[in-house]
Amino acid sequence: YRCFCSSERLSALRSEQMANKETPRYDGHCLSLDPEESEERSSNGTTYVVSLNVPTEGECIFHDELRDEIRIAWSQVDHQVLRKSDGFPTYHLANVVDDHLMNITHVIRGEEWINSGPKHVLLYEAFGWVPPKFIHLPLLRNPDKSKLSKRKNPTSIFHYRDAGFLSEAVVNYLGMMAYTLPDKREVFSIADMSETFDTSRISLGGPIFDVSKLKWLNGRYLREQLSANDLLARLGKWKFNDEFLGKILPLALPRLETFSDFGPLASFLFAEKVEIDTDSISGKLEPADAARLIKTAEWELEKLREWEGEPIGNVFNRIAEIEDLKLKQFMPTFFVAITGSGVSLPLFEAMAILGPDLS
């Protein structure tokens, strides 16, 4: 149905509901509009969105391949906007249409999407389409059982690639998350898993993503699955190759007197993490200020579309301008955070080589 409510009305409604300690949701005001009036206002060019007509009573019942029957009261489902005022569809509408047109048979997603199930079921019914099978997987957890987030462990797959993990080991480890092979073995290929995969063997308990266990498994692959020649080839493909070393050498050369100087200067570019030498920081900031600036830099760097030395440097120059600081006042903190030392290769160019995930 068309909804003509202004942003002011919606904001006032939200404020009133929050003041009454109610869950903010649309009240279905425009659902009661006479169809002729709705058509007339649309024809006159009045701005509107298209919202999902959700039943007011009863509950949505749908089947999950892992959880069997899921029941959610319609009163808990909001009137989702399906098409924005500019004519573009929102995620929920686009998702259902795309899945249907691509003949998707199984929708496999995280359990945080369970509450969106009724919206999608309602859309499939509205279109007269047979919905796919739904599988809502348990979310990965940190060792302390908290929800997996990059604040505690890196979550980008590119981080583990750049840090030197084998793709086979990462796939193997992810395959172990909430799933076990019938013979209980821990080292297996994706082909092995494909041959025996059965959704009924997936555990609903929150699987723990433990980096130390991943490292242990990766070590087994290095020692048991690869020959010496394979290892040399993989090391070369990873970072010990002319292309990667060729990027570092121009930065290191002005600081080299012997070949043995190269290792200490460039070692951070081959490490997943660095040992922090806080004593080497000159012009120290207060810890709270340093933490705030590091977080600010992280947010700003995440916006970069071009990960090169100059754009990276521009980010730090903007931070210096906003904070009314000189670069020399806070850059030592970032030198140590990235390289582990207050003396190293030119930082912006080194970060460009290191990549966004490890940086």
Which positions does each model-derived feature cover?
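Active-site cores that bind ATP or allylic diphosphates and position pyrophosphate for catalysis
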Residues: 6-136, 141-150, 156, 181, ...
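Basic, alpha-helical terminal appendages of large translation-related enzymes
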Residues: 1-51, 237, 242-247, 263-359
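Short, charged/polar micro-motifs that form catalytic or ligand-binding hotspots
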Residues: 110, 160, 204, 320, ...
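N-proximal short alpha-helices
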Residues: 90-93, 143, 187, 320, ...
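Catalytic adenosine-cofactor/nucleotide-binding cores of aminoacyl-tRNA synthetases and other
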Residues: 115, 127-133, 137-276, 339-359
